[in-house]
Design a protein with these regions (language model features):
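Active-site-proximal cap/lid insertion segments
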Residues: 3-8, 15-196
Length: 196
């Protein structure tokens, strides 16, 4: 994050694919190619960013498989703007309808610190973004297995903060935890950490 002096290459990384000035996709709504990112060549029209970043990571691992390596993969998912693949968005819209989990009165709790907090987790686009990221993680894990590196490579999966949960159009609910991104409550600072 930040100007060029803060980019990965300036911090000791040898290769940078897609790392740029912000935590979301470069130039706003760029989860699909053309990305318009000076650190990532455009792929075929409509190529999905999480899949592309996973494939770039596997290529890096293939190139460096004979020596110790560090691959640091930061998916822009599920950062705003919220844009999912059409097939996944439709899948989760149907699931929400099946569960009868449409937005209803009471979806937001009473105002807390002049904001209302989302209490219902039923955002189809957000769910689609999560699944696409999960598939991309699977691509990297499959690449490690194919290259015979899965038993000799530590993989860490983590996030940087809790989800946005306030009523300004953001999709997540961190309940039963209090708060979300930007709050010092557990909903803002508790995050996943998986080590394999």
């Amino acid at each position: 994050l930040g100007p060029e002096g803060f980019w990965p290459e300036s911090q000791g990384f040898d290769v940078n694919r897609g790392g740029i000035t912000r935590g979301g996709p470069y130039g706003g709504k760029k989860y699909f190619s053309p990305y318009g990112n000076p650190r990532l060549k455009d792929g075929p029209p409509g190529e999905h960013l999480p899949a592309r970043l996973a494939n770039e990571t596997v290529k890096f691992i293939e190139t460096n498989r004979e020596k110790p390596f560090l691959a640091y993969l930061s998916f822009y998912s599920v950062h705003t703007p919220l844009i999912a693949r059409k097939d996944l968005r439709q899948k989760y819209l149907a699931k929400r309808k099946q569960l009868d989990a449409a937005a209803v009165a009471g979806e937001f709790s009473k105002r807390e610190h002049r904001r209302r907090v989302r209490t219902l987790q039923a955002h189809a686009v957000y769910a689609g973004m999560i699944e696409a990221m999960d598939q991309a993680v699977g691509t990297v894990l499959s690449g490690l297995k194919r290259l015979g590196l899965e038993k000799n490579t530590a993989v860490f999966f983590m996030s940087d903060n809790g989800g946005l949960s306030t009523s300004e159009g953001h999709p997540t609910s961190n309940l039963p935890l209090r708060g979300g991104k930007g709050w010092m409550y557990e909903g803002g600072i508790r995050e996943p950490l998986i080590v394999r």
